[in-house]
């Protein structure tokens, strides 16, 4: 993919940084890259790409809001040395003041979640053409977007395939650089990348230089899912009070670490905090209201787990608003995230050039926390609902039953 500027009256691209992490095959990065007249190509290679663009959006310049948006198409970890963990679905965090429809309040800011890309939720901040661009990106990319005083940083993540030459070039109006790397060493503490860093002249778009580089940094996340035996299941039979079972029987306590499960629940479910006791619970957790009486998207909760055992979290379903679509069930889904978090002696949030900022449950931990991903599984439950076309019959039957009961009681009393 060659570098193309994103220009509009409502947003202007200022900088572009493309990072390519190639799969290792015994050859150096220099052997895999071709430079032809200032255009860098990477033929017959596979790997991962972080495509970062910094844009200026004038309509946001006077607003103090900080906004962090992420979008992930699947529930797998997909953690790489150039991509931190992005939770499944569509997540927004903001410190905006005032109320925002469907957002829930937490001590650190307002939060919104959906398992589909909700472009309508972005219209409060962004011009329509920018939202349309993000919607197109969401079809084939994972996204991580931050907004600070008019500057919007858009990070797109996708795979490099060996049938794509992946040309990289400069432009006349955008400051452009590219990094092409592969992993030298990687463990739970440090990551080392080596390769080439290329820059282009702003104004002419001509290649300035490509130079060899090597650097070390600390990652805030490590993927332990392939080494773990942590399963996420629904206890059978599944009913209106589904029980999520988190199997940590193969895990043992770790010094300075705790195991956790994080839930983004849609409003069709709630947690009884006196039954399943969460460490944190924000959002809609009223025990009686039906889903259509709630204003927020649902709730978020964090549970501390016990290693060496099967942990259970009991959910409760709400009454679903009747519809006339002919279906007796409504499909509701949620995706629990299981991980363990450890205290370290350094501020990890400032140690990686690829880290974009706190997402999801990270907001509730200190900057010196290291996260280890264990599992994230999408769960779907069919909830019963009434057919609204039968409302009159149901109301008449209910009224008749009430009248019969009253008459029966009167007869027994007198």
Curated annotation (Swiss-Prot):
Domain of life assignment: Eukaryota
Q: Which cysteines are joined by disulfide bonds?
A: none
Q: Which residues lie on this side of the membrane: Lumenal?
A: 1-390
Q: What is its main location?
A: endoplasmic reticulum
Q: Which UniProt keywords apply?
A: Endoplasmic reticulum, Glycoprotein, GPI-anchor biosynthesis, Membrane, Transmembrane, Transmembrane helix
Single biological process term from Gene Ontology: GPI anchor biosynthetic process
As one GO molecular function, the record gives:
mannosyltransferase activity
* Cited function: Required for proper folding and/or the stability of a subset of proteins in the endoplasmic reticulum. Component of glycosylphosphatidylinositol-mannosyltransferase 1 which transfers the first of the 4 mannoses in the GPI-anchor precursors during GPI-anchor biosynthesis. Probably acts by stabilizing the mannosyltransferase GPI14.
**Name by which UniProt lists this protein:** Protein PBN1
Q: Record the organism.
A: Kluyveromyces lactis (strain ATCC 8585 / CBS 2359 / DSM 70799 / NBRC 1267 / NRRL Y-1140 / WM37)
